[in-house]
């Protein structure tokens, strides 16, 4: 596990973004952990998150010309990742995001930021049903850009209704790579090194055995 991945998990635990217990997901499944990226909600959190996303992007090796943040949660992620790439890696990465509703005055249109073109990496917090990806794909197609990859903070590595995960569906349907700061396996590796979290580790392992891909 890379240092930034460990730091991400520790920040998520500290901010209670990542919690252990028994949680009922939208799918109806009972999960032993819950992840709510909305609790990364201060300036320092955002600065750190940007660094983690930037590190994951560089680790992926994907050729990226622009970061796209789907409204609404993807907007601060794209922004802070672009800042981190400039500050820590001397990469001046263009970014843009969409509005939910087109603006009919001022600069107009549905996009804000750099022109949407080239190899685009979409950044978001998690993928559940993949709806935001599908909507964003339409926007990217309209501008004749290419979706090169999707970057999220956590890959739960669990099946959807069928035999594959929502992430695998996105990779299959759009021919792009989805990568993340951490995966469920990374979380399990982290928990394995924390003796006081053994009960949580056992519960997460059991959940992976039942629903994992």
Curated annotation (Swiss-Prot):
GO terms for cellular component: cytoplasm. The keyword Glycosyltransferase applies. The keyword Coiled coil does not apply. GO terms for biological process: 'de novo' pyrimidine nucleobase biosynthetic process; 'de novo' UMP biosynthetic process; pyrimidine ribonucleoside biosynthetic process. InterPro entries: OPRT, Or_phspho_trans_dom, PRibTrfase_dom, PRTase-like. Its EC number is 2.4.2.10. Homodimer. PANTHER family: OROTATE PHOSPHORIBOSYLTRANSFERASE 1-RELATED. This is Orotate phosphoribosyltransferase. It comes from Photorhabdus laumondii subsp. laumondii (strain DSM 15139 / CIP 105565 / TT01). The lineage of its organism: Bacteria, Pseudomonadati, Pseudomonadota, Gammaproteobacteria, Enterobacterales.
């Amino acid at each position: 596990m890379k240092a930034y991945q460990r730091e991400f998990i520790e920040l998520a635990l500290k901010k209670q973004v990542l919690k252990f217990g028994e949680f009922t997901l939208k799918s109806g499944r009972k999960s032993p952990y819950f992840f709510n990226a909305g609790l990364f909600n201060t300036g320092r959190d955002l600065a750190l998150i940007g660094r983690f996303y930037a590190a994951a992007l560089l680790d992926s090796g994907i050729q990226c010309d622009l970061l796209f943040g789907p409204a609404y949660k993807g907007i601060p992620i794209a922004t802070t990742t672009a800042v981190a790439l400039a500050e820590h890696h001397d990469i001046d990465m263009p970014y843009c995001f969409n509005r939910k509703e087109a603006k009919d005055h001022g600069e107009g249109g549905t996009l804000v930021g750099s022109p949407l073109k080239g190899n685009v990496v979409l950044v978001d917090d998690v993928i559940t049903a993949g709806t935001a990806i599908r909507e964003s794909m339409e926007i990217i197609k309209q501008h004749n850009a290419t979706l090169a990859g999707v970057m999220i903070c956590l890959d739960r590595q669990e099946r959807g209704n069928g035999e594959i995960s929502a992430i695998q569906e996105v990779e299959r349907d759009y021919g792009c790579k989805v990568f993340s700061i951490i995966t469920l396996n990374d979380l399990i590796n982290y928990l394995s090194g924390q003796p006081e979290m053994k009960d949580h580790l056992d519960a997460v392992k059991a959940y992976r055995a039942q629903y994992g891909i």
